[in-house]
Design a protein with these regions (language model features):
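Short glycine-rich phosphate-binding loop at a beta-alpha junction
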Residues: 58-65
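Acyl-thioester C-C bond-transforming condensing/cleaving domain
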Residues: 2-5, 13-58, 71-76, 82-197
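Short, internal active-site loops enriched in acidic
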Residues: 67-69
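Structural signature of FAD isoalloxazine-binding scaffolds in flavoprotein oxidoreductases
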Residues: 8
């Protein structure tokens, strides 16, 4: 079993407010609203490999996570981000979710793989674009069949669900993930500047 596991280097994409939010200066967010989480993950993986002088061919495993699956290829997002970063298709790639802790869990999972001797080099991290969170119409499968639009004059009686809010709101405490992290920062005295560093 490996005793020493190190993070060689890292890269991150710009941090932007989601499309429905406001930036610190009061202007609307959404600067990266048209860039998928997978593309952002690909960019971060390429950057980390370049900064650490590591060839994509030397990667033994890719582990990427996110809170919400917000684009059409998101179910296997790690694979698409890894392939986009030119990691060979033979390399196993794992997508996971631990809500806001997904990126950190990816690093923990990658470290465990190395410690157990399953891999020597693991790319691990998170990717997200909440501006692309879909709206969901629950019950539509029962009402309308796939590829058949509603008939003229029919009313949609299903409630529209905002996937962003329903998935990031903790039903037990009634708070959103961001509110929870803000509260923890207040209690621990962590500033926004320290958080972003």
């Amino acid at each position: 079993m490996a005793e020493d596991v190190v993070i060689v280097n890292g890269a991150r994409t710009p941090f932007c407010e989601w499309q429905g939010g406001k930036r610190g200066d009061g202007n609307p967010g959404g600067l990266l609203k048209d860039v998928s989480a997978i593309k952002l993950g690909e960019i971060a993986i390429k950057g980390a490999l370049e900064k650490s002088n590591t060839s994509p061919k030397d990667v033994d495993h890719v582990v990427m996570g996110y809170a919400l699956q917000t684009c059409d290829q998101a179910i296997f997002g790690a694979r698409h981000a890894g392939l986009g970063a030119e990691i060979p298709q033979e390399v196993p790639m794992l997508t996971l979710s631990r809500i806001c802790g997904s990126g950190v869990q990816s690093i923990v999972t990658g470290a465990q793989m190395i410690m157990l001797g399953e891999a020597n080099t693991v790319v691990a991290g998170g990717m997200e674009n909440l501006s692309q969170a879909p709206h969901v119409l629950r019950g539509m499968r029962d009402t309308y069949k796939l590829a058949r639009p509603p008939k003229a004059g029919t009313e949609l009686e299903k409630d529209m669900e905002d996937y962003l809010f329903t998935n990031l709101l903790d039903g037990f405490c009634g708070s959103f993930m961001a509110q929870t992290s803000d509260e923890i920062c207040k209690r621990k005295g962590v500033t926004r500047e320290e958080t972003d560093a």
